[in-house]
Structures are given as C-alpha cells and as structure tokens.
Amino acid sequence: KNIARIVGIESTGRLRCCGADMNKLGTLDDAWLLAEDGRFAAFGRMDSLGDIAADEVVDAAGGMLFPSFCDSHTHLVYAGSREREFLDKINGLSYEEIARRGGGILNSADRLHETSEDELYAQAMERVREIAAMGTGCVEIKSGYGLSTGDELKMLRVIRRIRESVPLEVRATFLGAHAVARAYRGRQGEYVDLVCNEMLPAVAAEGLADFVDVFCDEGFFTVEETARILKAARKLGLRAKIHANELAVSGGVQVGVACDALSVDHLERMGREEIEALRGAATMPTLLPGAAFFLGMSYPPARAMIDAGLGVALASDYNPGSS
C-alpha cells in the first residue's frame, strides 16, 4: 500500500507494443497492489482499498513500483572474461580482426572446454544473483561457447540447473552456430552439418533449449547456412532467434523474418530494406546498445524503426568480451 506510482500498467492484455504506442506507459498514482500465489491479483487507488485480508502488508511509504526487466539476450554462462582483448580494441582492432586472430568467441570456447560443469554453474549463479538484485526478473541465456556437442550440452545443462535454482523466469537458447570451432577451420560446411545432424538432435533429446540462435553475419554464418540450421531446428520444435546485422548488412533480418524468428538481435547495420522487411512481421527487433557502446560501433537506428511502426526490445547482451 501507499505506492506513489505504479509504472507499466497494462490492463488490456496486449502482448506487443509497436511504434508510437511504445510512448504510452500506463501509470497509477497513490496506489495499492494485491499479490496472490506469486501473481498480481488486483490493484487500485488507495481511496478504493477497503478491507482486504492479507497475510502480509508492505507499506511502500511513497516508493514507486516498476516491472522487473526482461533481458532477452544474454551469454551469462562462460568461463572467465576476455579483458585482455580490451587492449586490442583500444589499440584499434575491430571485432572481426580479433576473431580472425583466434580471440573473441573462440577464446571463450577454449576456456570453457577446460572448465567443469560445476564451476561453470557456480560462476553463472553469481552473475544471475547480480542481475536479479539489479531488477531483472526474466532472462534468456544462450549456449555458444562450447562449439562441440559435448561442451554445448554442458552449457545447456548449466542453464537448466540455473532455471531450477532461482525464482527468475529463465529461457535457454542453443547457439551452437556462434562461430566455427577451431577443429573445423576451413571446413565450415562440415561444422554446419555437425550442428544440424548431431548437436540439434542431442539438444532436443534432452529438452535443453527453448530456442535456437545463429550468428548470421559477415565472417560467421551465411544466409543459406542460417536458413538450413533454423529449418532443422524447427523440425525439432525449436523456434529461431538470430544474431543479425551487427557487422554488416548480412541478410540476417530477411532470413529471420522468412523463418518466423521470434527476434532478430543487434541490428547495428540497418537500411530501409531491413526496416521494411520487419514491418508487419511477427519477428521482434532487439537492440543491444551496450555492445555497440563497448565496441565503438554506431547505434542501431532505433528512432527510424519506431517511426516506421516497429516494436523495439532492449537487452543487455551480457557476455565475457563485448558487453
């Protein structure tokens, strides 16, 4: 009771907010809120409170109440950060140049391979407790630092343990196509075969993932490879999410829409064609400004996207090397 303002009231039950409607934020001043069995049951102004039986009464004393943050793009499970690469960045090397030198994702994969599942879980739980304390109530966590069947499954099992251990809503995404493993250098097609024919069936057999993701961008996976992986995943009941257009206009947006992806994420490199492709689509553009800031890249054209009537989601891209 005695809440100065409840922010983010949505009484119509809509699941999607786009364009100019994103500027309409429902609020209620001088309010009370009733929770039952972990869910909000009722709310109203203090002058309508009346006599409500409650096991516990919390006096907000004029505080404000905000929804928890839904962080829909993270890489929280990893074995140590890549702080040494920050020196490369400030000395002028790009993300792609660091990756070509064996850094970036491949660096994280090497370290994860040497780390046990229990240690990965312990490290990740520290990060989960940190984001929960800062207001995150729902989080998506990706694999993608394994790049082998065994290590990808290890990551996803850690995510499952996290889901079973915390009150947050946790969703798991299989990202075996984050980069081509060192063992498959020069044999990218064979690595895509591995993802489609071995990794995906193993992930599905254990029920370890809610979604599948592909890094569809210059120097990583092509549109054709992305479509093949996503179609294989769909047959196993996994819906798509895509890393797209971070480094170049890659075609990732268009293949995401064509494959009915839940979201296309990053989008630092967007043109009119990409914005038009998203108009009327179910696919949600997701922006990761922390990564753009850390990497010294241009921010995605959020205002142009909203003015075109698109919905825009924000996520942290919490990861060991670029956000």
Q: Where do the protein language model's features map onto the residues?
A:
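Metal-coordinating catalytic core of metallo-dependent amide/deamination hydrolases
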Residues: 106-124, 129-130, 137-250
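Divalent metal-coordination and catalytic microenvironments
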Residues: 3, 33, 38, 62, ...
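N-terminal metal-binding scaffold of metallo-dependent hydrolase/deaminase domains
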Residues: 1-51
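Hydrophobic/aromatic beta-strand patches that form the interior of the parallel beta-sheet core
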Residues: 1, 56-59, 70, 173, ...
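Metal-associated gating/positioning segment near the N- to mid-region
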Residues: 56, 60-123
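Active-site-adjacent C-terminal substructures of enzyme catalytic domains
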Residues: 239-240, 249-323
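Alpha-helical segments flanking ligand/cofactor-binding loops in enzyme cores
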Residues: 67, 129, 227, 231, ...
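Short active-site segment of divalent metal-dependent hydrolases/proteases
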Residues: 76-77, 246, 320
